[in-house]
Amino acid sequence: RGLGDVYKRQSLGQVFGAIFHNDQILWPSLAYLLYSLAYVITNGVLFYMYKFVIGKPNDFWVVGVIATIIGFCISPMFPILNKYIPRKWLFIAGQTCMVLAYVLFIFGRDNVFLMDLGLVLLNINFAQLVTVLTLTDAIEYGQLKNGQRNEAVVLAVRPMIDKFTGAVSNALVGYIAIAAGMTGSATAADMTAHDISTFNMVALYIPLAL
């Protein structure tokens, strides 16, 4: 049976029960929730940043190229690094890269190199990879602690978080577009200081705090 079928059979009560009765799932899940929420919100507004804030919509293609290249490099590199570097430090490194990315997005918009560097740092997803491995390890921990092996329930945690953060991101991106006047035939020249401030607050400052 496919994992999709397994996930469908798990009720929300079972998933939340697995989270709250296994502290090794609870804290990584919370960390992943905050990471995922920040990442998907920022990723969802990058087009608006390039079109309405920076005024270079034709340069938006570089976002997908950098994300693809970094994704292909980081995933195979992670297990090699993990042989020599503890997961805790890889997680901290991933979060540090993300914070630096936000700093560059806020202060380095006029510099193409700094913007590209910010995109590189944003896509270094060590935090995500560490969380996935920690949740997998939590299956054994839960069996030792509670006497039950809830493998399917534990594996359903991450997809559930992804769906939740995706829904929140879609709502916030729509709100940002309307609240900051980034709709219709508007251009970067039409943006006021208030519009940019609204964009920065929801698209960058709040995710940075997360």
Predicted regions and their residues:
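Short, small-residue-biased leader/transition segments that mark boundaries at the very start
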Residues: G2-Y7
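Pair of pore-lining "gating" transmembrane helices in MFS-fold secondary transporters
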Residues: F20-V45
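Short amphipathic helix-loop junctions that connect adjacent transmembrane helices
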Residues: G44-D59
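Helix-to-loop junctions at the C-terminal end of transmembrane segments
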Residues: I74-R87
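Structural signature of the two symmetry-related core transmembrane helices
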Residues: W89-L104
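Hydrophobic core of transmembrane alpha-helices in multi-pass small-molecule transporters
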Residues: F113-Q128, T134
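A late C-terminal transmembrane helix in Major Facilitator Superfamily
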Residues: Q148-A180
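A membrane-interface helix-boundary motif in multi-pass transporters
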Residues: Y175-A209
